[in-house]
Amino acid sequence: MNKVILAIAFLLSFSCIGKSSHCHAQNKLYDEQLLKKIKPIAPTSASLGRYGDHPVDLSTGQVPIEIPLYEIKSGDLSVPIKLKYHSGGIKLNQEASWVGLGWNLDFGGSVVRTVNGFPDEKENPEVPDVEKVLEEMDNDPKGDNCYDKYNLWNKAKDYQCSFRPDLFCYNIGNLSGSFFLINDSIVTTASVPIVGCINNNTQRLVSPDGNVYIFNASETTTISSSHVKMPPYTSTYYISSIISPNGTDTIRYNYQNSGEYSTRTGTTYQGVSIINRVIIRRAPEESEWKPQQEILPIPLTGNDIYVGSVKTVKPQYIFFRGGRITFNLSERKDLATVSGNITCKKLDNIVIERKTSNKYETVKKIEFHYSYFGETLTDSDAPQKLRLCLDSITEYGKGDDELYTLRLIASFDYYGKKQLPDKNAYSVDYWGYYNGNKSSDNIPKTDLQTYKYAKVGSADRTPNEALMKYGSIKSMTYPTKGKTEFLWEINRVGLANHLYESPYVRDNCI
């Protein structure tokens, strides 16, 4: 039976469109939602029977899209393996993960690090933290130590220090959240009590239920440019073992090198020089001399190129009581490989095996089928033009009759699959989504006028609702031939009787 599921769920601001008698109540509701602090949402496991259930989060407008693939059960421990899709839109310079653009594979846990300024553990020890800097400035109102403070800010500018700690976002079990490391102690940003420590590039987190998560597999990132002196740092920590509260059950992870890829991000800049001068000119209708101000545009001086490289790892085996899971990889074309290193890989299949005696027997095999967003004529320009696209997932394994069968888990369609331009194109809006406007730089077009008129920049960064959805998922088809269609539109926010557009993609309908 063919069935199409189309459930409409508008954002809060759209509730005001309709009868005017409803506007004030909806606006009040929106104000309350706006003032609430958005907390991390614990991911939930879905079942195959609930594929079509995709409720819209009313605070973010996003949709949880998850596809369960397998669940590891080892004594008191259980780990779901599932695909998750981020429904916040696809930015033009966004790279695809090892399972396709917009998708991520959850296989047990990870800690992703956002470096604020300079890596915490590699900061200049002579530089005080931000609290000490502020205290010193408060105690020196006359500025007697200006030279020392000038040197301090110069070190911050050169990335020898930072005035904010790095942010760590974790995903373990059914919990997600974030924390900071302050004096080697974890300070969480949510009410979920997570206990942990970091030592010799290993993180140890303990969840409220007592499970211990050890992270000592990692990815390393390096960033450099003419203005940045950033040493290599650990950007992602991957789970290496999960231990039950009583210590009787353990799930272990082995990792494989999945290549090193490079990224190039260019920025252009243009300034103006505001010159105050007295023009020796008498206004014809006035008797006094008038000082005038002149604005002189400074020509573009070129791009500042930020070059980054990421050394990646991916799971090879997961060992648990009574079996193991194997992850098989193959080469991909859409990531630029660092010279002399292994080509980056994508996930080809997952093999679930049962241990009998001293041998492993295949129970099922999950295959991932890909193509690419964009088009290219040569392999040399593939890293700039292509993005890995997940088309479908199939499963080969034993059915209820103990016979091996092949079945579809899900297939996907996307908006504008062949229309996305180069990753570094300037055709983006203020938030980085594709808008189709061609430009020679990414500086927003701005008109300045005092005594003389000047223009700065040439880019039209206006959002385009039709084009910003390019690359986002359009529909998902299930084994029953049922289908869920996803309709996306620009996010809008409203206060009182005004409605404002916020130019980035969020979901409108499912």
Region annotations inferred by a language model:
Residues 207-210, 244-250, 256-258, 320-323, ...:
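Acidic, low-complexity segments
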Residues 67, 81, 214-219, 230-233, ...:
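Aromatic-rich beta-strand edge motifs centered on tyrosine
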Residues 26-240, 244-247, 283-286, 292-309, ...:
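Long, intrinsically disordered, low-complexity, charged/polar and glycine-rich segments
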Residues 202-205, 240-242, 314-318, 348-351, ...:
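Beta-strand elements of repeat-based all-beta scaffolds
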